[in-house]
Amino acid sequence: MNFPKYVMTNTNDLDMAIREAKNPMCEWYDANHDDLPYFENIVTGEQFGNYHHTSWSCGHCPGRWAESLFFSQLVTGMELDPVVFQKLKKWVFKVYSNHINLPANIDLNTFELKKEVDLCNLRESFFGLTAVYLYDHDIRVFTIAEKVIATVEKYFDFENGRWDSTAYEEATGAKSVGLFTGDLEQTRFCNTFGRFIGGLVRYYEISHSAAALTLACKLSDVALRSVVLEDGTFDPDRTAAHPYSTTSMLSGIALLADITGDMLLFNRLKSFMENGFYQIAIDTGWVTENLNRTNLVGEINNSCDLLEVCLFLGKAGFSKYYERAEQMLRGHILPSQLLDTCFISDKNYIDDSKNHMARRVKGAFGFPTPYGHEDEPGSVISYNWDIIGGVSGLCWSKCHQTTENNDIYSINLLFDYENHDIKFSSPYQHDDILSIKLRAKKNLRIRLSSRIDLKKLKEELKKSGIIYCILGDWLYLNHLMVGHTYSFCFPFIEEDKEYIFKNHHLTFRWKGDSIIAASSEGKRLCFFQELS
């Protein structure tokens, strides 16, 4: 193994990123314990290997993996291995076989289910139930989901936003724990029922369940009254210091806003992205793993939750949020994917939890810094298997990359794109040259980065003889001939921008919505060339 200054990255190819990210989810199952997925992964140091968790191995990873694998097949056409999916389906159902009406934790000594639920897992278990139904239409999903919803309605106090764990335990014999941030945090709204909103919305989309939609709306009301306030701030006294508690809730509220068109929800999300976001993150898309940290270890789950918020805000008409989404993709999420495993052992171990680690971990997302895989030389590097939010974020990006409304094609995210109507070649991938070819008569608009030289762009378009109109953040090209390829320079502006997070000073060189260099003196495994 070696630890070079720079690692190989991908900042342009969404399909490749999704394809590589599927790899670990097809690999890490414990054959000695009924194919239970692993949760914890450590690729450097003395704790090298994969490990189980009493809650997240059984209640979290199966649902998250099932949803991500099915979603990736849906948006890319990449076939889902049915053997792998059946392993996940087994656990999606198994955690509900303990007669407590909520997803159970597992005893790591006996590997039997416990009379115990980690309320954090409600969202991921519903992701799994939804994916199982979409994949093979198993109607057991509806019976389980409706029982969960009824249980939450019975024991959750919507006035004060608290779970009545005592009454629930008296009725079922099951303890409610808050392993997400420690037992004392079990009544935190964000990391339990707040994050459940997204799972309910995904389930509603397959079931049209009135109970699911009602519960999602009631929980969102609690969120708006107690956590997602008008001022948009991130207050750890309300949310807990672990941002994933909050970001996972925000992505769920964005899903609800999308299906309802509720502008109150969109405006609260927008307020957070303009205020609270900068308490936990920077424009590149990096988000701290925990606000109590003094180092720069982040978490891709957090980044991709907020990416999804940006995508749905963009869809709602706030076009600047498509720019923020592309900056997050190109500036952090894509380059942070583990594609270069030169620093990870690929030894053959008898213990399958360590065997051929480098090959089987490739494609994972984890806890990156703004500049690389490693915080400081010698820091432990981990890719825990709940960080599959990276796949979900990429899949949602594919969905929003190009959209069509009222016979107008919108290029929202400037990645290469091709279908039966259009072929688009991105200037980021082709030396600043944008090319477009219509295969059917369409009106077209392309989102403009705020870092583009409009004067030069107009000169380029005039030189090319292209009829155009610029309105706000959009370049309209409504008179293109079918079958003709139009190519012109898309003149991005380069800008060095400094960010201060706590006591850390970070400088990045932007070109359009991508990063081409960064400050990283003394660091290893870096994503970007060091600023000169």
Model-assigned labels for residue ranges:
Residues 1-532:
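Glycan-recognition and catalytic cores of secretory/periplasmic carbohydrate-active enzymes
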